[in-house]
Every structure is written in C-alpha cells, then in structure tokens.
C-alpha cells in the first residue's frame, strides 16, 4: 500500500487474482475516536476504504476489545463469522499482527508504532500504513518508500 493503486493492481484484478492482503490493527482502529469506548464503525470504515482501493483487509484484535466496543452484539457476530479475528485471551495481539504481517509479507493499518516490539520485528515500521477517520471518511497515508529514522 506504499503507492496509489496502479496498473499492476488493475491487471491483477482483471485477471481474477486475489487482492493483496492488508492487516488491520482492529483494536487500534476501534479506539481511534475520542473516548474510552471502541467504535465498530471505525473498523467498518477502514475495511471499506481498503476494499475500495483494491485490498483485502484482515482484521485482528485483542480479546479485551469485546469488553470495550460499542456494538457488542454485532462485534460478536463478526467474530463468530470470522470477519474479525480475535487473539486468544491473555495474549498480545500485537505479536500476532506483526508475525502475520511478516509471514504474509503484508502491510498493517495502525497508528501504533510497535516500539516495544522493534527488536523482534525491525521491519514493522516499513509495513505501517497510518490513517485518520474524520467525519466518517478514512484517509490512508501514502508512502513511496521505507521510512528512515
């Protein structure tokens, strides 16, 4: 997701190839609005934006989000349906997000800098796509190359 959608993505789409996978740090996205409560709408908006741009979102969250989300019944339905993947209780979802991103060579939508995991995942910063949700619209950061410290 480092660049805007271009000819390569259009070619893959026309050939029926699966869209590129992007991991969504669902807990981070849900809590990107004001207040302590997570908002399921933020997750939906980010996923819709990614699909609109030709990507397939995979939402990963920590188990605590189920106690912090505003639309609990709908959230549980999405977890049960596999739309949202929840890390096991008592584990660190960040580890799973970073591990999957490395294994799948995927980008991560998150405003978390994962500084506490920098030693184990030195490539994490180059995988990040920062975002903002403003008045129901999602803006994704566009980068043309890796970040430099």
Task: Write out the residue ranges for each language-model feature.
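Acidic, polar low-complexity linker/tail segments
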Residues: 1-18
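Nuclease catalytic cores that cleave nucleic-acid phosphodiester bonds
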Residues: 13, 19-22, 29-35, 40-149
